UniProtKB/Swiss-Prot annotation:
<dbReference type="InterPro" id="IPR036220">
    <property type="entry name" value="UDP-Glc/GDP-Man_DH_C_sf"/>
</dbReference>
<keyword id="KW-0520">NAD</keyword>
<dbReference type="InterPro" id="IPR028359">
    <property type="entry name" value="UDP_ManNAc/GlcNAc_DH"/>
</dbReference>
<feature type="binding site" description="in chain B">
    <location>
        <position position="331"/>
    </location>
    <ligand>
        <name>NAD(+)</name>
    </ligand>
</feature>
<feature type="binding site" description="in chain A">
    <location>
        <position position="22"/>
    </location>
    <ligand>
        <name>NAD(+)</name>
    </ligand>
</feature>
<feature type="active site" description="Proton donor/acceptor">
    <location>
        <position position="212"/>
    </location>
</feature>
<dbReference type="InterPro" id="IPR036291">
    <property type="entry name" value="NAD(P)-bd_dom_sf"/>
</dbReference>
<feature type="binding site" description="in chain A">
    <location>
        <position position="263"/>
    </location>
    <ligand>
        <name>UDP-N-acetyl-alpha-D-mannosaminouronate</name>
    </ligand>
</feature>
<dbReference type="InterPro" id="IPR001732">
    <property type="entry name" value="UDP-Glc/GDP-Man_DH_N"/>
</dbReference>
<dbReference type="GO" id="GO:0016628">
    <property type="term" value="F:oxidoreductase activity, acting on the CH-CH group of donors, NAD or NADP as acceptor"/>
</dbReference>
<keyword id="KW-0560">Oxidoreductase</keyword>
<dbReference type="InterPro" id="IPR014026">
    <property type="entry name" value="UDP-Glc/GDP-Man_DH_dimer"/>
</dbReference>
<dbReference type="Pfam" id="PF00984">
    <property type="entry name" value="UDPG_MGDP_dh"/>
</dbReference>
<comment type="function">
    <text>Catalyzes the four-electron oxidation of UDP-N-acetyl-D-mannosamine (UDP-ManNAc), reducing NAD(+) and releasing UDP-N-acetylmannosaminuronic acid (UDP-ManNAcA).</text>
</comment>
<feature type="binding site" description="in chain B">
    <location>
        <position position="252"/>
    </location>
    <ligand>
        <name>UDP-N-acetyl-alpha-D-mannosaminouronate</name>
    </ligand>
</feature>
<dbReference type="GO" id="GO:0051287">
    <property type="term" value="F:NAD binding"/>
</dbReference>
<feature type="binding site" description="in chain A">
    <location>
        <position position="216"/>
    </location>
    <ligand>
        <name>UDP-N-acetyl-alpha-D-mannosaminouronate</name>
    </ligand>
</feature>
Amino acid sequence: MKLDKSKQKEINKICVVGLGYIGLPTASMLAIQGYKVIGVDIDEERVKTIRDGKLIINEQGLMTLLTGAITSGNLVVKTEPEEADVYIICVPTPATADKNGKKCDLICVLSAVNNIKPYLKDGDLIIIESTIPPKTTEKIYDDISKNTGKNIYMAYCPERVLPGNILKELVENDRTIGGINKKSAQLAKEIYASFIEGNLYITDSTTAEMVKLMENTFRDVNIALANEFAKVSTELDINVWDAINLANKHPRVNILNPGPGVGGHCISIDPWFIVGSSENAELIKKARNLNDDMPKYVASLIIKEFKEMGICNPKVGIFGITYKGDVEDTRETPARAIIDYLLQNDFEVSIYDPYAKDFEYPLNTIEESIKNSDALIFLTDHSEFKNFEKEDIKEISHMMKNKIVMDMKNTLNHNLWEEQGFNVKLLGDGKSWIVKTL
């Protein structure tokens, strides 16, 4: 969609604060549409990298988009904001521990708001994309109005994209835009309409905040149900994957897949923002705690299984540490806690992940993680793992001390591995585990 030149006169400059997974693609997209964009990030190294035309995240198509935005002269990146007509805040909102579990830490959002306050003028529009608890936009708006005396517009428009497919979803996905008032929502809609092909739905800011939290909480609660089914199935000698497949034949049933836990910057965090906003969020809290406990359950299952098999101080290859398949993102990954538990119980761990770049523990080659190992533990469903062929598996079998595979995401072609003499243990398949209950 091309930029309406009449609107370009109204909005001469946009300042995007936070140049991470969401901010950088958004800033680049707006610049390509013809807006003058100032991209701001407090990380000097990140700003330098972007200025040099290099990627800070591995995202398909982003290099081309970023290069076009910079060479057009429409995108300039800095460490400090400057006067603009629109400010879009795309900074992290992590969760920190509190008495109820976890709570939203707004320090980055509030810092971003404070940094732009000196540049605000009457008629400016502030848009928050960061995930925040209900009523946060209202509170920030009231604070700005009280402490600056400026008559501004303000809206909340949460991102709704999947790492690994950000640019496509940034353009094609529907968006919810919540304004402090109708004029704020309408102004924000005009900005997003310049590049979004999906539908744009207008509401108030508090509803929009809740919408984002509901989307991710829905998935978290349903994953918790699947994980509980996996635990029960293990106890009852049932294969949960077969049971889920058959249950989903019902036209009104769609059970999600179980796994070793929930990770990423959204689903594992956002439900806590509802829990912290209401005492009635009992189911949400229980589901979140269940998913948070899955890494401990998985690690305990592994530890006890090795004891039952009589293998002491086992060496295991951990295959996959990112929070989901085919991405490099390790934020909130359940693999972290699983590895911690194994190391605390005298396991020797060698980690291989074809996507991850940085992690708390050393990353090794695939050969290093296989050689002389007692088992391979698959925690992430990368395509590379799914595509292991007969000859690959045969070669792997010759390198290992014991032929054991533990598949926590139902990633592998189990028949191929069993043909090569592997003992395959699948999360949620009671028949494959010696240990049934913890």
